[in-house]
Amino acid sequence: MPTRRLLREEIGERGVQIYESRLRALLEPQFRGQFVAIDVESEDYEVANDAALARDRLWTRRPDSQILIERIGYPAAFNAR
């Protein structure tokens, strides 16, 4: 059954929650300044030096993913639908 497409705001809220609760402590010490693409449904993620590369790698594994991209160690995030 296909997953319902989320609104941009929902992707942002879920992605930030996943980053803050699961990934921040794991990723910031080693990957500060890189990008993490987070699938907000599966909570799978991919880290890369380039936002598009992180997104594309995650889409390769999860073609239907709904992705938030966060710069590790920085406050801004953006949606990569």
Describe each model-derived feature in a short phrase.
Residues 1-30:
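Short N-terminal "domain-start" leader segments
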Residues 25-75, 80:
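Amphipathic, hydrophobic secondary-structure cores in small proteins
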